[in-house]
């Protein structure tokens, strides 16, 4: 079993590469149309150094198209991408100078070692000291296997080497698109341990992932999109605090009556039934009022407890609400 090595000293020399307004990456009214289809619709995203932004959306929501426009691979129909204050379409060199990205499965020479693969990238980039390669291998917990041929690596090891490869040129922005896709739980945990360190060392990390619990654990902020439109953006803690509710347990035979009784109370915003319990959107100190109201109507509450939504619950609630709104023009990228 591979052992997780103790992280070494910081490996980043990321300088002050943000624009004067503090954002290292900023999209303004970013829009992409493919014929009649609008894949990305007036999207505004901001990212500063030293933070992780979780970029979330269902399949076909426009995440990949957005990443393509940030990297200069897809030309916007309207709007701009600013990297370190410069519009990437006007200054295409700014992308290679400041951005590292791992999209799907990274490609390496199979008969070369992990260390030599990174050295090859360093030679191509120029002015990368040998010590940086060793520091990066230590950062991604690959020092012990760095001399082995790439073709002998597990999927998790290949993914970690891919992250190291994005850091060879010490980019200000690191884009990780589904970095734990296909990994076993141990591999996912390894990647989760690496991502916060990137932010701690000054990198701005854009994390596109379907692993909602993973994003919740490592992100400072999240941006949730559907059909190319922004649904919600903000700090993880603030968004989850908005989803606080009271969970009320009642007998299954009484659950519909309890829901109807509570829904009539002026201090209750909403009542849902989930997994056989009532989820009541009401002030956190409303537990005694809920209990009293139910008793007065002949319903016994077996449990009343304050809860808060997980990021997964918030994501599902937002995307389901917008799906029910009957939007048209489903994005495909």
State where each predicted segment sits:
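Generic structural signal for isolated residues within well-ordered alpha-helices
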Residues: 94, 120, 135, 238, ...
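Short, charged/small-residue-rich alpha-helical element at the C-terminal edge
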Residues: 245-321, 333
């Amino acid at each position: 079993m591979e052992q997780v090595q103790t992280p070494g000293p910081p490996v980043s020399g990321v300088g002050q590469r943000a624009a004067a307004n503090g954002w290292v990456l900023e999209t303004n009214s970013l829009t992409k149309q493919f014929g009649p289809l609008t894949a990305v619709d007036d999207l505004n995203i901001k990212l500063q150094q030293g933070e992780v932004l979780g970029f979330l959306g269902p399949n076909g929501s426009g995440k990949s198209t957005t990443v393509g426009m940030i990297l200069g691979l897809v030309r916007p129909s309207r709007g701009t991408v600013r990297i370190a204050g410069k519009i990437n379409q006007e200054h295409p060199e700014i992308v290679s100078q400041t951005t590292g990205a791992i999209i799907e499965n990274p490609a390496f020479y199979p008969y070369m070692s992990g260390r030599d693969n990174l050295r090859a990238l360093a030679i191509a980039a120029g002015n990368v000291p040998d010590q940086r390669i060793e520091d990066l291998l230590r950062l991604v917990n690959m020092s012990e296997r760095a001399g082995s041929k790439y073709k002998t690596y597990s999927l998790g090891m290949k993914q970690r080497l891919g992250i190291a490869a994005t850091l060879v040129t010490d980019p200000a922005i690191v884009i990780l698109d589904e970095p734990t896709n296909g990994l076993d739980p141990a591999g996912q945990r390894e990647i989760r341990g690496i991502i916060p360190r990137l932010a701690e060392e000054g990198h701005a990390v854009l994390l596109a992932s379907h692993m909602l619990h993973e994003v919740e654990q490592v992100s400072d902020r999240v941006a949730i999109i559907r059909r190319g439109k922004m649904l919600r953006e903000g700090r993880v803690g603030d968004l989850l605090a908005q989803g606080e509710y009271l969970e009320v347990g009642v007998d299954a035979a009484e659950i519909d009556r309890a829901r109807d009784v509570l829904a009539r109370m002026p201090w209750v915003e909403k009542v849902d039934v989930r997994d056989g319990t009532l989820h009541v959107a009401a002030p956190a100190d409303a537990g005694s009022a809920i209990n009293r109201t139910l008793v007065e109507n002949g319903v016994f509450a077996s449990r009343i407890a304050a809860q808060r939504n997980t990021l997964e619950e918030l994501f599902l609630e937002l995307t389901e609400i917008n799906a029910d709104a009957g939007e048209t023009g489903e994005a495909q990228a």
